[in-house]
Amino acid sequence: MNKRDELIGLCIDFLAKVKDKTANANIERWLNENYGPDSETYQKISTLVIDGVAEGWAANDEISGPHYRRSRLCEPCAETFYFSITAVYMDSKGHELDNQQRTFRGDYHSHPYGELNMVIPLDEGAVLAGPLGWQGAGWTAPAPGSQHYPEVKNGALIAFFFLPAGRISYDFQAQG
């Protein structure tokens, strides 16, 4: 079995445990308590995701350059309980916006059915904006209908996420 298949197998095991949960602030807290960076699940999945990015089989499609890449590793199917599995690499170094936080923003989008997002920092101090604030190693869980920029600061990280029915929409304009 190759690493990609091993990763998808681990994700299926994880999804079997969360398939009936709806993304929201309570689930975000629950994920961080039960599947946070000290958990075996987080450690095994994050190690394979980091390997995948380094080896070029995960987050390998450039969006706006090598600092912002994405790839879907698995489409929604019965085996994944109809969740898709996607990896996004974002690096704020050298690409910061001229704002107080010095962040890098990806493409504005919406989550019709929510998102379960494992945050995997590659640089010490790298964090991703989430519904409950800045998140280092751990989880964010934007609720169904949420819209946001994926936003990172303090370096590189991987957002490794699970979308119910694979639903994500880029057909929205940012508010304000």
UniProtKB/Swiss-Prot annotation:
InterPro entries according to UniProt: PnbB
Keyword Lyase listed: yes
Keyword Lyase set for record: yes
EC number(s) from the headed UniProt entry: 4.3.3.-
Keyword terms of this UniProt record: Lyase
Catalytic activity: 4-hydroxylaminobenzoate + H2O + H(+) = 3,4-dihydroxybenzoate + NH4(+)
Domain of life of the source: Bacteria
GO molecular function: ammonia-lyase activity
Annotated function: Lyase involved in the degradation of nitroaromatic compounds. Catalyzes the conversion of 4-hydroxylaminobenzoate to 3,4-dihydroxybenzoate (protocatechuate). Required for the catabolism of 4-nitrotoluene.
Family: Belongs to the PnbB family.
Name this polypeptide is given: 4-hydroxylaminobenzoate lyase
Organism field: Pseudomonas putida (Arthrobacter siderocapsulatus)
Gene behind this protein: pnbB
